[in-house]
Protein backbone atom coordinates (compact mmCIF):
# COMPACT_ATOMS: atom_id res chain seq x y z
CA UNK A 1 0.00 0.00 0.00
CA UNK A 2 1.36 3.40 -1.01
CA UNK A 3 1.40 5.98 1.79
CA UNK A 4 1.21 9.72 1.27
CA UNK A 5 4.10 11.50 2.98
CA UNK A 6 4.81 14.96 4.32
CA UNK A 7 5.68 16.40 0.92
CA UNK A 8 2.05 16.04 -0.20
CA UNK A 9 1.37 19.64 0.87
CA UNK A 10 4.24 20.93 -1.27
CA UNK A 11 3.07 18.84 -4.23
CA UNK A 12 -0.47 20.28 -3.99
CA UNK A 13 0.84 23.83 -3.74
CA UNK A 14 3.10 23.23 -6.70
CA UNK A 15 0.13 21.87 -8.63
CA UNK A 16 -1.97 24.96 -7.91
CA UNK A 17 0.89 27.25 -8.94
CA UNK A 18 1.35 25.25 -12.14
CA UNK A 19 -2.36 25.57 -13.00
CA UNK A 20 -2.30 29.33 -12.37
CA UNK A 21 0.81 29.74 -14.54
CA UNK A 22 -0.79 27.71 -17.35
CA UNK A 23 -3.95 29.82 -17.16
CA UNK A 24 -1.90 33.02 -17.39
CA UNK A 25 0.06 31.63 -20.33
CA UNK A 26 -3.25 30.75 -21.94
CA UNK A 27 -4.25 34.40 -21.77
CA UNK A 28 -6.32 34.39 -18.59
CA UNK A 29 -5.72 37.65 -16.73
CA UNK A 30 -4.98 38.02 -13.01
CA UNK A 31 -8.28 39.90 -12.64
CA UNK A 32 -10.16 36.94 -14.05
CA UNK A 33 -8.47 34.78 -11.43
CA UNK A 34 -8.86 36.98 -8.35
CA UNK A 35 -11.68 39.45 -9.02
CA UNK A 36 -15.15 39.27 -7.51
CA UNK A 37 -16.20 36.83 -10.20
CA UNK A 38 -12.75 35.33 -10.66
CA UNK A 39 -12.00 31.64 -10.74
CA UNK A 40 -10.24 31.60 -7.37
CA UNK A 41 -12.91 33.76 -5.73
CA UNK A 42 -15.67 31.50 -7.03
CA UNK A 43 -13.74 28.45 -5.85
CA UNK A 44 -13.53 29.92 -2.33
CA UNK A 45 -17.22 30.74 -2.44
CA UNK A 46 -18.07 27.21 -3.53
CA UNK A 47 -15.93 25.81 -0.71
CA UNK A 48 -17.73 28.00 1.86
CA UNK A 49 -21.13 27.03 0.48
CA UNK A 50 -20.16 23.37 0.71
CA UNK A 51 -19.04 23.90 4.32
CA UNK A 52 -22.26 25.77 5.17
CA UNK A 53 -24.31 23.04 3.53
CA UNK A 54 -22.51 20.35 5.52
CA UNK A 55 -23.10 22.30 8.76
CA UNK A 56 -26.79 22.72 7.96
CA UNK A 57 -27.07 19.02 7.16
CA UNK A 58 -25.46 18.23 10.51
CA UNK A 59 -27.90 20.52 12.33
CA UNK A 60 -30.86 19.02 10.46
CA UNK A 61 -29.77 15.52 11.46
CA UNK A 62 -29.53 16.60 15.11
CA UNK A 63 -33.04 18.08 14.90
CA UNK A 64 -34.36 14.85 13.39
CA UNK A 65 -32.74 12.90 16.22
CA UNK A 66 -34.39 15.26 18.72
CA UNK A 67 -37.77 14.65 17.10
CA UNK A 68 -37.21 10.89 17.24
CA UNK A 69 -36.43 11.23 20.96
CA UNK A 70 -39.37 13.53 21.78
CA UNK A 71 -36.86 16.20 22.73
CA UNK A 72 -36.79 19.98 22.49
CA UNK A 73 -33.18 20.07 23.73
CA UNK A 74 -29.91 18.39 22.84
CA UNK A 75 -30.14 14.69 23.60
CA UNK A 76 -28.26 13.96 26.86
CA UNK A 77 -24.74 12.78 26.14
CA UNK A 78 -24.69 9.39 27.88
CA UNK A 79 -21.24 8.24 28.93
CA UNK A 80 -20.20 4.66 29.61
CA UNK A 81 -21.46 3.65 33.05
CA UNK A 82 -24.40 6.08 33.07
CA UNK A 83 -27.93 4.72 33.53
CA UNK A 84 -30.90 6.96 32.64
CA UNK A 85 -33.46 7.01 35.46
CA UNK A 86 -36.98 8.11 36.31
CA UNK A 87 -38.76 8.36 39.66
CA UNK A 88 -41.45 5.93 40.81
CA UNK A 89 -43.42 7.98 43.35
CA UNK A 90 -45.53 5.02 44.47
CA UNK A 91 -42.55 2.86 45.41
CA UNK A 92 -40.29 5.81 46.28
CA UNK A 93 -37.45 4.50 44.15
CA UNK A 94 -35.46 5.33 41.04
CA UNK A 95 -36.01 3.09 38.03
CA UNK A 96 -34.27 2.54 34.71
CA UNK A 97 -35.73 4.93 32.12
CA UNK A 98 -36.08 4.53 28.37
CA UNK A 99 -32.95 6.10 26.89
CA UNK A 100 -34.78 6.67 23.61
CA UNK A 101 -37.23 8.76 25.69
CA UNK A 102 -40.38 7.21 24.25
CA UNK A 103 -43.34 9.13 25.63
CA UNK A 104 -40.91 11.40 27.50
CA UNK A 105 -40.21 8.50 29.82
CA UNK A 106 -36.78 9.90 30.68
CA UNK A 107 -36.98 13.68 30.30
CA UNK A 108 -39.14 16.57 29.10
CA UNK A 109 -37.72 20.10 29.18
CA UNK A 110 -41.09 21.73 28.53
CA UNK A 111 -42.32 24.62 30.66
CA UNK A 112 -45.12 22.38 31.94
CA UNK A 113 -43.17 19.26 32.91
CA UNK A 114 -39.75 20.70 33.85
CA UNK A 115 -38.47 17.13 33.84
CA UNK A 116 -34.69 17.44 33.53
CA UNK A 117 -32.76 14.30 32.50
CA UNK A 118 -31.24 12.34 35.41
CA UNK A 119 -28.65 9.57 35.32
CA UNK A 120 -27.02 7.41 37.98
CA UNK A 121 -23.90 5.32 38.28
CA UNK A 122 -23.86 2.24 40.50
CA UNK A 123 -21.41 0.10 42.42
CA UNK A 124 -19.57 -2.70 40.65
CA UNK A 125 -21.20 -5.21 43.00
CA UNK A 126 -24.64 -4.16 44.17
CA UNK A 127 -27.31 -5.42 46.56
CA UNK A 128 -29.42 -8.54 46.03
CA UNK A 129 -26.62 -10.20 44.10
CA UNK A 130 -26.83 -7.73 41.20
CA UNK A 131 -23.86 -6.21 39.40
CA UNK A 132 -23.30 -2.98 37.51
CA UNK A 133 -23.57 -4.95 34.27
CA UNK A 134 -27.03 -6.15 35.33
CA UNK A 135 -28.30 -2.60 35.73
CA UNK A 136 -26.66 -1.37 32.52
CA UNK A 137 -28.56 -4.02 30.56
CA UNK A 138 -31.75 -3.92 32.64
CA UNK A 139 -35.14 -3.24 31.12
CA UNK A 140 -37.14 -0.05 31.53
CA UNK A 141 -38.77 0.09 34.95
CA UNK A 142 -36.12 -1.93 36.80
CA UNK A 143 -35.78 -0.42 40.31
CA UNK A 144 -32.36 0.77 41.49
CA UNK A 145 -32.03 0.87 45.30
CA UNK A 146 -30.51 4.06 46.70
CA UNK A 147 -27.82 2.00 48.44
CA UNK A 148 -26.49 0.87 45.05
CA UNK A 149 -26.13 4.40 43.63
CA UNK A 150 -22.71 6.08 43.67
CA UNK A 151 -23.45 9.28 41.72
CA UNK A 152 -26.42 11.18 40.31
CA UNK A 153 -26.06 13.79 37.56
CA UNK A 154 -28.54 16.11 35.85
CA UNK A 155 -28.25 17.24 32.21
CA UNK A 156 -28.08 20.98 31.53
CA UNK A 157 -28.47 21.30 27.74
CA UNK A 158 -26.76 24.00 25.69
CA UNK A 159 -28.87 27.15 25.63
CA UNK A 160 -28.90 30.87 24.99
CA UNK A 161 -30.48 33.52 27.18
CA UNK A 162 -31.05 37.16 27.93
CA UNK A 163 -32.01 38.88 31.18
CA UNK A 164 -35.72 39.52 30.82
CA UNK A 165 -36.02 41.62 33.97
CA UNK A 166 -33.81 42.67 36.88
CA UNK A 167 -30.53 43.14 34.97
CA UNK A 168 -27.82 44.34 37.40
CA UNK A 169 -30.45 44.99 40.07
CA UNK A 170 -31.32 43.74 43.52
CA UNK A 171 -34.43 42.05 42.13
CA UNK A 172 -36.45 40.51 44.94
CA UNK A 173 -38.52 37.79 43.32
CA UNK A 174 -38.84 39.67 40.02
CA UNK A 175 -35.64 38.77 38.16
CA UNK A 176 -36.17 36.46 35.21
CA UNK A 177 -34.28 34.91 32.28
CA UNK A 178 -35.59 34.20 28.79
CA UNK A 179 -34.16 30.90 27.51
CA UNK A 180 -33.79 29.36 24.04
CA UNK A 181 -32.17 25.95 23.59
CA UNK A 182 -29.52 25.45 20.89
CA UNK A 183 -28.80 22.75 18.31
CA UNK A 184 -25.80 20.50 18.94
CA UNK A 185 -22.65 22.54 19.55
CA UNK A 186 -23.82 25.32 17.23
CA UNK A 187 -25.38 28.68 18.07
CA UNK A 188 -28.52 27.86 16.07
CA UNK A 189 -31.74 28.25 18.06
CA UNK A 190 -34.06 25.23 18.02
CA UNK A 191 -37.23 27.30 18.30
CA UNK A 192 -36.73 30.54 16.37
CA UNK A 193 -40.33 31.70 16.79
CA UNK A 194 -39.22 35.12 18.04
CA UNK A 195 -37.43 35.95 14.79
CA UNK A 196 -33.87 35.20 15.96
CA UNK A 197 -32.56 31.97 14.47
CA UNK A 198 -28.96 32.24 15.70
CA UNK A 199 -27.80 33.17 19.19
CA UNK A 200 -25.05 35.75 19.45
CA UNK A 201 -21.94 36.23 21.54
CA UNK A 202 -21.59 39.31 23.76
CA UNK A 203 -19.03 40.79 21.38
CA UNK A 204 -22.13 41.69 19.34
CA UNK A 205 -23.99 43.29 22.25
CA UNK A 206 -21.37 45.59 23.81
CA UNK A 207 -21.14 43.10 26.66
CA UNK A 208 -24.81 43.48 27.64
CA UNK A 209 -27.19 40.55 28.05
CA UNK A 210 -30.42 42.47 28.59
CA UNK A 211 -31.05 43.77 25.08
CA UNK A 212 -33.67 41.23 24.05
CA UNK A 213 -31.21 39.22 21.95
CA UNK A 214 -30.38 35.64 22.93
CA UNK A 215 -26.73 35.15 23.90
CA UNK A 216 -24.97 31.77 24.07
CA UNK A 217 -24.33 30.90 27.72
CA UNK A 218 -20.52 30.83 28.16
CA UNK A 219 -20.49 27.59 30.18
CA UNK A 220 -21.13 25.72 26.92
CA UNK A 221 -18.47 27.53 24.89
CA UNK A 222 -14.74 27.28 24.29
CA UNK A 223 -14.12 30.70 25.90
CA UNK A 224 -12.11 29.84 29.03
CA UNK A 225 -11.94 33.52 30.05
CA UNK A 226 -15.67 33.32 30.72
CA UNK A 227 -15.72 29.87 32.31
CA UNK A 228 -15.89 27.79 29.13
CA UNK A 229 -14.09 24.46 28.84
CA UNK A 230 -12.01 25.05 25.72
CA UNK A 231 -14.57 23.18 23.61
CA UNK A 232 -18.07 23.90 22.37
CA UNK A 233 -20.40 21.59 24.32
CA UNK A 234 -23.91 20.29 23.66
CA UNK A 235 -24.50 20.36 27.41
CA UNK A 236 -22.98 19.56 30.80
CA UNK A 237 -23.77 17.06 33.55
CA UNK A 238 -24.08 18.63 37.02
CA UNK A 239 -24.01 16.82 40.35
CA UNK A 240 -27.59 16.48 41.60
CA UNK A 241 -26.53 16.95 45.23
CA UNK A 242 -23.56 18.36 47.10
CA UNK A 243 -20.67 15.93 46.99
CA UNK A 244 -20.14 13.30 49.67
CA UNK A 245 -17.63 10.58 50.52
CA UNK A 246 -18.03 6.94 49.49
CA UNK A 247 -17.73 5.74 53.10
CA UNK A 248 -20.36 8.10 54.55
CA UNK A 249 -23.41 6.22 55.76
CA UNK A 250 -26.98 6.96 54.76
CA UNK A 251 -28.96 9.09 57.22
CA UNK A 252 -25.79 9.66 59.27
CA UNK A 253 -26.28 6.30 60.97
CA UNK A 254 -22.73 6.39 62.36
CA UNK A 255 -23.12 9.87 63.90
CA UNK A 256 -24.52 10.80 67.29
CA UNK A 257 -24.10 13.57 69.85
CA UNK A 258 -21.18 11.61 71.32
CA UNK A 259 -19.27 11.28 68.01
CA UNK A 260 -15.83 12.93 68.11
CA UNK A 261 -14.18 11.59 64.93
CA UNK A 262 -14.02 14.69 62.74
CA UNK A 263 -13.56 12.71 59.51
CA UNK A 264 -16.99 11.21 60.18
CA UNK A 265 -18.59 14.45 61.37
CA UNK A 266 -17.33 16.44 58.38
CA UNK A 267 -18.16 13.73 55.85
CA UNK A 268 -14.51 13.31 54.82
CA UNK A 269 -14.56 9.54 55.32
CA UNK A 270 -11.46 8.03 53.75
CA UNK A 271 -10.65 11.36 52.01
CA UNK A 272 -10.50 9.56 48.65
CA UNK A 273 -13.63 8.76 46.66
CA UNK A 274 -16.50 11.13 45.86
CA UNK A 275 -20.16 10.15 45.70
CA UNK A 276 -23.19 12.25 44.76
CA UNK A 277 -26.14 10.88 46.72
CA UNK A 278 -29.16 12.02 48.74
CA UNK A 279 -29.50 11.49 52.48
CA UNK A 280 -25.79 11.55 53.38
CA UNK A 281 -23.70 14.25 54.98
CA UNK A 282 -21.85 16.38 52.43
CA UNK A 283 -18.05 16.26 52.23
CA UNK A 284 -16.74 19.33 54.06
CA UNK A 285 -13.47 20.38 55.68
CA UNK A 286 -11.55 20.04 52.41
CA UNK A 287 -9.25 22.59 50.70
CA UNK A 288 -9.82 23.85 47.15
CA UNK A 289 -6.70 21.98 46.00
CA UNK A 290 -8.06 18.70 47.29
CA UNK A 291 -11.54 19.43 45.93
CA UNK A 292 -10.09 19.77 42.44
CA UNK A 293 -8.07 16.59 42.88
CA UNK A 294 -10.86 14.32 44.13
CA UNK A 295 -13.32 15.75 41.59
CA UNK A 296 -10.98 14.99 38.69
CA UNK A 297 -10.25 11.53 40.09
CA UNK A 298 -13.87 10.54 39.46
CA UNK A 299 -13.21 10.23 35.72
CA UNK A 300 -10.16 8.04 36.40
CA UNK A 301 -12.34 5.66 38.44
CA UNK A 302 -9.35 3.77 39.84
CA UNK A 303 -11.52 2.18 42.56
CA UNK A 304 -14.11 1.01 39.97
CA UNK A 305 -16.85 2.89 41.80
CA UNK A 306 -18.60 4.51 38.82
CA UNK A 307 -17.99 2.45 35.68
CA UNK A 308 -16.69 5.41 33.68
CA UNK A 309 -14.32 5.19 30.73
CA UNK A 310 -11.76 7.90 31.51
CA UNK A 311 -10.86 8.62 27.88
CA UNK A 312 -14.36 9.85 27.00
CA UNK A 313 -15.13 12.32 29.77
CA UNK A 314 -13.84 14.98 32.14
CA UNK A 315 -14.92 15.54 35.74
CA UNK A 316 -13.95 18.58 37.75
CA UNK A 317 -15.07 20.97 40.49
CA UNK A 318 -17.74 23.45 39.51
CA UNK A 319 -17.03 26.96 38.25
CA UNK A 320 -19.14 30.12 38.57
CA UNK A 321 -20.15 29.87 34.91
CA UNK A 322 -21.52 26.36 35.42
CA UNK A 323 -23.28 27.40 38.62
CA UNK A 324 -24.77 30.25 36.57
CA UNK A 325 -25.89 27.86 33.82
CA UNK A 326 -27.97 25.96 36.39
CA UNK A 327 -29.19 29.11 38.17
CA UNK A 328 -30.36 30.85 34.98
CA UNK A 329 -32.28 27.81 33.77
CA UNK A 330 -33.83 27.49 37.23
CA UNK A 331 -34.78 31.19 37.24
CA UNK A 332 -36.72 30.83 33.99
CA UNK A 333 -40.02 29.32 32.92
CA UNK A 334 -38.20 25.98 32.68
CA UNK A 335 -37.34 25.90 36.38
CA UNK A 336 -38.37 26.79 39.94
CA UNK A 337 -38.75 30.52 39.39
CA UNK A 338 -40.20 32.69 42.16
CA UNK A 339 -43.13 34.65 40.79
CA UNK A 340 -43.40 37.10 43.66
CA UNK A 341 -41.81 37.60 47.06
CA UNK A 342 -44.45 35.49 48.78
CA UNK A 343 -42.32 33.32 51.06
CA UNK A 344 -43.55 30.20 49.28
CA UNK A 345 -42.33 30.21 45.67
CA UNK A 346 -38.69 29.80 44.70
CA UNK A 347 -36.12 27.32 45.96
CA UNK A 348 -36.46 26.32 49.60
CA UNK A 349 -33.40 26.09 51.83
CA UNK A 350 -31.72 22.91 52.94
CA UNK A 351 -31.47 23.96 56.59
CA UNK A 352 -30.60 20.53 58.00
CA UNK A 353 -27.90 20.43 60.69
CA UNK A 354 -27.40 17.96 63.51
CA UNK A 355 -25.44 20.57 65.43
CA UNK A 356 -22.79 18.54 67.23
CA UNK A 357 -21.40 21.24 69.53
CA UNK A 358 -18.32 21.08 71.76
CA UNK A 359 -16.77 23.23 74.43
CA UNK A 360 -14.55 26.02 73.15
CA UNK A 361 -11.53 27.93 74.38
CA UNK A 362 -13.43 30.96 73.15
CA UNK A 363 -15.89 31.82 75.90
CA UNK A 364 -18.01 33.78 73.41
CA UNK A 365 -19.59 30.71 71.87
CA UNK A 366 -19.13 26.95 71.69
CA UNK A 367 -17.54 25.29 68.65
CA UNK A 368 -19.99 23.78 66.19
CA UNK A 369 -19.32 20.61 64.18
CA UNK A 370 -22.06 20.98 61.59
CA UNK A 371 -23.45 17.72 60.23
CA UNK A 372 -25.50 18.18 57.07
CA UNK A 373 -27.75 15.86 55.06
CA UNK A 374 -27.98 16.21 51.28
CA UNK A 375 -31.28 16.83 49.51
CA UNK A 376 -33.23 17.94 52.58
CA UNK A 377 -35.63 20.86 52.88
CA UNK A 378 -36.81 22.86 55.84
CA UNK A 379 -40.45 23.56 56.65
CA UNK A 380 -40.41 26.96 54.92
CA UNK A 381 -38.53 28.63 52.08
CA UNK A 382 -36.23 30.72 54.27
CA UNK A 383 -35.85 28.24 57.11
CA UNK A 384 -32.58 28.21 59.06
CA UNK A 385 -30.97 26.25 61.86
CA UNK A 386 -28.82 28.38 64.12
CA UNK A 387 -25.10 27.71 63.81
CA UNK A 388 -24.79 28.08 67.58
CA UNK A 389 -27.09 25.28 68.67
CA UNK A 390 -26.72 21.66 69.69
CA UNK A 391 -28.95 18.63 69.36
CA UNK A 392 -30.77 17.60 72.52
CA UNK A 393 -29.64 14.04 73.28
CA UNK A 394 -32.11 11.49 71.97
CA UNK A 395 -34.36 14.07 70.32
CA UNK A 396 -33.72 13.12 66.69
CA UNK A 397 -36.78 11.32 65.29
CA UNK A 398 -36.65 9.76 61.83
CA UNK A 399 -40.24 9.60 60.62
CA UNK A 400 -39.32 8.15 57.24
CA UNK A 401 -40.32 11.04 54.99
CA UNK A 402 -39.12 13.62 57.51
CA UNK A 403 -36.71 14.08 60.41
CA UNK A 404 -37.55 16.02 63.56
CA UNK A 405 -34.77 17.43 65.74
CA UNK A 406 -34.87 19.47 68.95
CA UNK A 407 -32.00 21.87 69.59
CA UNK A 408 -30.69 23.94 72.47
CA UNK A 409 -29.52 27.45 71.63
CA UNK A 410 -26.04 28.44 72.78
CA UNK A 411 -25.90 31.94 74.25
CA UNK A 412 -23.14 34.47 73.63
CA UNK A 413 -21.48 33.65 76.94
CA UNK A 414 -21.41 29.93 75.97
CA UNK A 415 -24.27 29.04 78.31
CA UNK A 416 -27.29 27.11 77.08
CA UNK A 417 -30.50 28.87 76.14
CA UNK A 418 -33.99 27.86 75.04
CA UNK A 419 -34.94 24.77 73.09
CA UNK A 420 -36.58 24.78 69.66
CA UNK A 421 -37.65 22.06 67.21
CA UNK A 422 -37.19 21.91 63.42
CA UNK A 423 -38.69 19.48 60.92
CA UNK A 424 -36.80 18.56 57.74
CA UNK A 425 -38.21 16.81 54.67
CA UNK A 426 -36.68 14.20 52.33
CA UNK A 427 -35.93 15.28 48.77
CA UNK A 428 -38.80 13.23 47.28
CA UNK A 429 -41.59 14.64 49.49
CA UNK A 430 -43.84 17.55 48.53
CA UNK A 431 -41.86 19.98 50.69
CA UNK A 432 -38.56 18.36 49.76
CA UNK A 433 -39.12 18.94 46.04
CA UNK A 434 -39.50 22.66 46.70
CA UNK A 435 -35.75 22.68 47.40
CA UNK A 436 -35.07 21.56 43.81
CA UNK A 437 -34.23 23.82 40.85
CA UNK A 438 -37.38 22.55 39.10
CA UNK A 439 -39.72 22.31 42.11
CA UNK A 440 -39.96 18.61 41.34
CA UNK A 441 -37.70 15.61 41.90
CA UNK A 442 -35.91 15.95 38.56
CA UNK A 443 -34.00 19.11 39.42
CA UNK A 444 -30.77 19.86 41.30
CA UNK A 445 -30.66 20.15 45.10
CA UNK A 446 -28.63 21.87 47.83
CA UNK A 447 -28.12 25.07 45.81
CA UNK A 448 -29.77 27.09 48.57
CA UNK A 449 -28.48 26.26 52.03
CA UNK A 450 -26.76 23.01 52.94
CA UNK A 451 -23.10 24.03 52.83
CA UNK A 452 -21.33 26.85 51.04
CA UNK A 453 -19.76 25.40 47.88
CA UNK A 454 -16.25 26.29 46.72
CA UNK A 455 -15.91 27.30 43.06
CA UNK A 456 -12.79 26.97 40.89
CA UNK A 457 -12.70 30.77 40.61
CA UNK A 458 -10.50 33.31 42.32
CA UNK A 459 -8.74 36.68 42.09
CA UNK A 460 -5.72 36.06 39.88
CA UNK A 461 -3.78 38.89 41.50
CA UNK A 462 -3.73 37.17 44.92
CA UNK A 463 -0.56 35.22 44.18
CA UNK A 464 0.51 35.31 47.83
CA UNK A 465 -2.31 32.87 48.53
CA UNK A 466 -0.91 29.33 48.25
CA UNK A 467 -4.01 27.96 46.57
CA UNK A 468 -4.14 30.77 44.01
CA UNK A 469 -0.50 30.07 43.14
CA UNK A 470 -1.42 26.43 42.58
CA UNK A 471 -4.54 27.19 40.54
CA UNK A 472 -2.60 29.54 38.25
CA UNK A 473 -0.71 26.45 37.03
CA UNK A 474 -3.89 24.55 36.15
CA UNK A 475 -5.33 24.30 32.63
CA UNK A 476 -7.77 27.17 31.94
CA UNK A 477 -10.64 24.79 31.24
CA UNK A 478 -10.66 23.80 34.91
CA UNK A 479 -10.60 27.29 36.44
CA UNK A 480 -11.26 30.94 35.69
CA UNK A 481 -9.46 33.96 37.06
CA UNK A 482 -11.21 37.17 38.07
CA UNK A 483 -9.62 40.61 37.92
CA UNK A 484 -9.18 43.00 40.83
CA UNK A 485 -6.48 44.40 43.09
CA UNK A 486 -8.62 45.28 46.10
CA UNK A 487 -6.72 43.94 49.09
CA UNK A 488 -9.04 44.33 52.07
CA UNK A 489 -12.58 43.46 53.08
CA UNK A 490 -13.59 47.12 52.95
CA UNK A 491 -16.57 48.14 50.84
CA UNK A 492 -14.22 50.18 48.64
CA UNK A 493 -11.89 47.28 47.85
CA UNK A 494 -14.67 44.76 47.30
CA UNK A 495 -16.41 47.22 44.99
CA UNK A 496 -13.17 47.81 43.09
CA UNK A 497 -12.93 44.08 42.38
CA UNK A 498 -16.63 43.75 41.61
CA UNK A 499 -16.49 46.58 39.05
CA UNK A 500 -13.35 45.12 37.47
CA UNK A 501 -15.37 42.06 36.41
CA UNK A 502 -18.51 43.65 34.99
CA UNK A 503 -17.53 42.27 31.58
CA UNK A 504 -18.08 38.70 32.78
CA UNK A 505 -21.51 37.25 32.20
CA UNK A 506 -23.34 33.99 32.76
CA UNK A 507 -21.84 33.54 36.24
CA UNK A 508 -24.77 34.83 38.33
CA UNK A 509 -22.82 37.76 39.72
CA UNK A 510 -22.85 41.11 37.87
CA UNK A 511 -26.07 40.44 35.95
CA UNK A 512 -27.94 39.37 39.08
CA UNK A 513 -26.82 41.92 41.67
CA UNK A 514 -26.30 45.65 42.05
CA UNK A 515 -23.54 45.55 44.63
CA UNK A 516 -21.04 43.32 46.32
CA UNK A 517 -20.95 44.01 50.02
CA UNK A 518 -24.13 42.86 51.69
CA UNK A 519 -27.44 41.50 50.43
CA UNK A 520 -27.46 43.02 46.96
CA UNK A 521 -28.11 39.97 44.78
CA UNK A 522 -31.42 38.75 43.41
CA UNK A 523 -33.87 37.53 46.05
CA UNK A 524 -31.85 39.44 48.70
CA UNK A 525 -29.10 36.81 48.54
CA UNK A 526 -25.63 37.42 50.00
CA UNK A 527 -23.27 39.38 47.75
CA UNK A 528 -19.72 39.69 49.06
CA UNK A 529 -16.99 39.83 46.43
CA UNK A 530 -13.54 38.28 47.04
CA UNK A 531 -10.47 40.31 47.98
CA UNK A 532 -6.75 39.57 48.36
CA UNK A 533 -6.71 37.44 51.51
CA UNK A 534 -10.07 35.80 50.71
CA UNK A 535 -9.68 35.34 46.94
CA UNK A 536 -11.93 32.31 46.25
CA UNK A 537 -15.66 32.28 45.51
CA UNK A 538 -18.16 30.22 47.46
CA UNK A 539 -21.81 29.92 46.44
CA UNK A 540 -25.29 29.11 47.72
CA UNK A 541 -25.15 29.81 51.45
CA UNK A 542 -25.44 27.27 54.27
CA UNK A 543 -28.04 25.81 56.60
CA UNK A 544 -27.97 28.79 58.98
CA UNK A 545 -28.27 31.61 56.42
CA UNK A 546 -32.04 31.73 56.01
CA UNK A 547 -33.31 34.26 53.46
CA UNK A 548 -29.83 35.33 52.30
CA UNK A 549 -28.92 31.84 51.04
CA UNK A 550 -29.80 31.03 47.45
CA UNK A 551 -28.95 30.60 43.78
CA UNK A 552 -27.49 34.09 43.45
CA UNK A 553 -25.55 34.18 46.69
CA UNK A 554 -21.77 34.65 46.40
CA UNK A 555 -19.18 35.11 49.11
CA UNK A 556 -15.42 35.04 49.59
CA UNK A 557 -13.11 32.55 51.25
CA UNK A 558 -9.40 31.76 51.46
CA UNK A 559 -9.40 28.22 50.04
CA UNK A 560 -8.76 26.43 53.33
CA UNK A 561 -10.96 23.72 54.82
CA UNK A 562 -13.93 24.59 57.03
CA UNK A 563 -16.76 22.58 58.51
CA UNK A 564 -19.41 24.35 56.41
CA UNK A 565 -17.64 24.43 53.01
CA UNK A 566 -18.41 21.72 50.46
CA UNK A 567 -18.32 21.37 46.65
CA UNK A 568 -20.12 20.14 43.55
CA UNK A 569 -18.89 18.12 40.57
CA UNK A 570 -19.43 18.82 36.86
CA UNK A 571 -18.95 16.26 34.07
CA UNK A 572 -18.55 16.88 30.33
Where are these regions (language model features)?
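N-terminal leader/signal peptides at the extreme start of proteins
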Residues: 1-10
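N-terminal signal-anchor/signal peptide hydrophobic helix marking the start
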Residues: 10-19
Amino acid sequence: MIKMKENNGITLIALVITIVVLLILAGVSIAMLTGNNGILTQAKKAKQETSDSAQKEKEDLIKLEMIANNSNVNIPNLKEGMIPVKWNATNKTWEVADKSNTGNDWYDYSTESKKWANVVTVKENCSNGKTRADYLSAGVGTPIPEDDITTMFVWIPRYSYYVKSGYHENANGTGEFAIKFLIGTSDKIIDSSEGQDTAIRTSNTNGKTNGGKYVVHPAFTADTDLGGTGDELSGIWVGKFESSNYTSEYNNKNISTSTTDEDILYGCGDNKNVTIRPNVTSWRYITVDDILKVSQNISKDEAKIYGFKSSELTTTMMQNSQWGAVAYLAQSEYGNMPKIDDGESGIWNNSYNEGITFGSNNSYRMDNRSVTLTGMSGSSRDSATSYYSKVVDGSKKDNGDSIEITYTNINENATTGDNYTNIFYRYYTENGQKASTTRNIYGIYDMSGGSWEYMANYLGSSIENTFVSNFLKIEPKYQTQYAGTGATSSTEDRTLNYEANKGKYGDAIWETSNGCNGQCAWNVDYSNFPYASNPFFIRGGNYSDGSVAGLFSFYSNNGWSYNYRSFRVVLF
